[in-house]
Amino acid sequence: MKKSIIAAAFALLFGAQGASAIGIFDNLCYQARLGYNIGGTMPMGMPASIRGLNSYTPKPSFTIALDAYKPLTEKWGMMAGFHFQTKAMETDARVKSYSMEMRQGSESLSGLFTGNVVTNAKQLVVTLPLQATFSVSDAVRLKFGPYFSYALNNEFTGYAYDGYLREGDPTGTRIELGNTPDSWGTYDFSDQMRHLQLGVNLGADWQFHHRWGVYADLAWGVTGVHRSSFHTIEQTLYPIFGTVGVIYRLK
């Protein structure tokens, strides 16, 4: 193990020296970012089993980031960074014949639920974006590219209430769920969420001062938040979040 770590350290060292020799680290501009995220995990299109949204509540979600920008030509460049992010939301939806697994008291239930479902989703992720940039002017820069995220912590919990569950299939035993905590059907699918996530990011930076600027980004996941082997929720849910925040130029 120790030999592997030493070998990796030497590889990084010589790799960095080689990159420096060809000028990759020349003329770099470093930026710190603080942003607020708003969005959620959602399907592409509204499935027939989801009849409407009673409420959507964004939860406090933030980005703390360090980016490095490298100009390649007068207009074009590239940007990479290290982003530490929280992404959270709560929804309350009306559903009909919605595939679910839940617990009511000590009993495990599965089948098709008609009623209301509350979902709380939260992730703590480290994101590595790699973007091409285009400078519209000295102050405004557009950017687009892929990102890679690793979830340090996943939460996907909630409860079904004020409805009924048909066990197994649409003709199964009908089980009533009320609107008080002891009559809800609760669920926790946190252990079925992916750790590695991929997506695309686009946005714009406006540097209105030598040091200070503002930015807006949109991150769209192309992998679902749950593992491919998870089929309790019929539709694939994707993380889609927008971010607005401030930039401070370090160099």
What are these regions, as identified by a protein language model?
Residues M1-N27, K251:
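Cleavable N-terminal export/targeting peptides
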Residues Q31, S61-A65, V125-P129, N201, ...:
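Membrane-embedded beta-strand positions in outer-membrane beta-barrel channels/transporters
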Residues A32-I38, A80-T86, F144-Y150, A216-W220, ...:
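Transmembrane beta-barrel strands of outer-membrane/channel proteins
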Residues K75-M78, A139-L142, H210-A216:
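Repeated loop/turn-to-beta-strand initiation elements of outer-membrane beta-barrel proteins
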Residues A21-P71, V140, S149, M193, ...:
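Short glycine/proline- and aromatic-enriched beta-strand/turn motifs that initiate or cap beta-hairpins
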Residues G40-K59, K87-Q123, A151-Q197, N201, ...:
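Extracellular/periplasm-exposed beta-strand and loop segments of Gram-negative cell-envelope proteins
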Residues A65-Y69, Q131-T133, D205-Q207, Y215, ...:
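Transmembrane beta-barrel domains of outer membrane proteins
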Residues W206-H210, Y238-K251:
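Outer-membrane beta-barrel "beta-signal"
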